[in-house]
Amino acid sequence: MKSDSVEITTICPDVENSQFVVQSNCPETIPEILKSQNAAVNGSGIACQQRSLPRIKILGTGGTIASKAIDSSQTAGYHVDLTIQDLLDAIPDISKVCDIEYEQLCNVDSKDINEDILYKIYKGVSESLQAFDGIVITHGTDTLSETAFFIESTIDAGDVPIVFVGSMRPSTSVSADGPMNLYQAICIASNPKSRGRGVLVSLNDQISSGYYITKTNANSLDSFNVRQGYLGNFVNNEIHYYYPPVKPQGCHKFKLRVDGKHFKLPEVCILYAHQAFPPAIVNLVADKYDGIVLATMGAGSLPEEVNETCMKLSLPIVYSKRSMDGMVPIANVPKKGSKEDNLIASGYLSPEKSRILLQLCLAGNYTLEEIKHVFTGVYGG
């Protein structure tokens, strides 16, 4: 070897993750990039140590992904029975991807997710951001989109990826989708390319934004959709992102206020409109709730007498839509013509996400004008 030559020996072609040794008679000729926090001087050269694995925190909440059925063909009527450790046992290869710590926050069907559990998830994520490179949350698919929206709206994670994952088939199914979904979610949370993208959802080989994703099929493996577009996919153990890192535009971040250990959000209900929808129902719930979300016909359509009833009330009422796709524009919402206009267009948000956004606004004591401004982030208001 010449006096100014450099020899690099590597144990595998994956330079990013392999261990390799650099030897040189003139260390000053070694590129500065090798003099990093992962490099240590060893003898006549520099030995770059193998990069440490990412640290991932898994928060378990239950759902179909943690469920068992009586036999292998049963895909309904199953029950939650598995812990995070049980799920990890089904994907032993994951130990090559990252170092994992986990916490079982609860083990329930996602229909039973309430405000106490929401706060546990919020607290679990908040307390893990500084110590881990990524966070994975196992969750039932029925209300996964609501929890993902809540977490995106209440936590500023910086660049740390937060990945929600679930499954449509129980663990005992002939072709259970849970193990692969979980494996992919952990890989996504571990990958540097996932940083700076906000809350993600990993299901059925697709990577989506947790802010906009919606469950559109009650039974199929391809049960979720996002009309704003998928962010990427997972193929043959590779993560492919279609766009550079970006977070949802107009996403308002709220600071939660907790009274001691008790977490309580204002009461907001959803009413589903239909032909001959009676205005009496609106009056009935107005006395018992802090706000109302209406799943309107079309893009904000309601019988005129219902509109008139809504405008007479003082509580905030959000006009959303029954359809899975589309939006309710401001122009389609009736107005009183004063600052006391209490009717709000949901924009692109579904009724269930509109409910959460309104709850967070009310919890923060926002005025009607401030609530409308928050909804302008999703082109409503």
Swiss-Prot record:
Superkingdom of the source species: Eukaryota
Domain Asparaginase/glutaminase: 54-378
Record CDD domains: L-asparaginase_II
Phylogenetic placement of the source organism: Eukaryota, Fungi, Dikarya, Ascomycota, Saccharomycotina
Name used for this protein in its record: L-asparaginase 1
Originating gene: ASP1
Alphabetical UniProt keywords: Cytoplasm, Hydrolase, Phosphoprotein
Classification via SMART domains: Asparaginase
Swiss-Prot/TrEMBL catalytic activity: L-asparagine + H2O = L-aspartate + NH4(+)
Other notes: Yeast contains two L-asparaginase isoenzymes: cytoplasmic L-asparaginase I, and cell wall L-asparaginase II.
